[in-house]
Amino acid sequence: MGKRPDYATVVYCNLIRHTYKKTPIIIGGIEASLRRLAHYDYWSNKVKRSILLDSGADLISYGMGEHSIIEIADALNAGIDVHDITFIDGTVFKTKNRDLIYDAIELPDYDEIKENKRSFAQSFYKQYCNTDPFSGKRLFEPYGGTTFVVQNPPAKPLTQTEMDEVYALPYMRNYHPSYEKD
């Protein structure tokens, strides 16, 4: 029915990574934002790990990414390696170096989350309590003690002027033309 593969972000990122091995891959949008940490997947009826690990992407820009994507682009343009971009609010990164994680709330390990509903609920509660852009804290989710997925605090919201600029862009304000009947 649809034209996208299931788990489109994972499929497309892995194809990009296979072809362009060292190209930075930054993902965003609804699929990446909702799957940035361990999450329940209705299609497979399982708790799945962060999309960052399954996709092979380097960073997630979650939520409203207008600020974070510009900061990421500026950092890359300044010559900062994508693996060193660990400081931008509204992003998620992965690391094997526990020392890179500071001032953060530890979530239950993925193996514990996928086996224990209470641990999953506790993890979700900590995530929920840290969604406010003014008081949200950095979170990290261990994967077997060797890999860590780190969610930086949420990005600050757009100002009224910035919001007006976004909505003044020439959007079609209509559904995509591919849905037109032939």
Functional labels for PLM-detected ranges:
Residues 124-182:
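N-terminal [4Fe-4S]-dependent radical SAM core
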Residues 1-144, 151:
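Glycine-rich beta-alpha loop elements in corrinoid/cobalamin-binding modules
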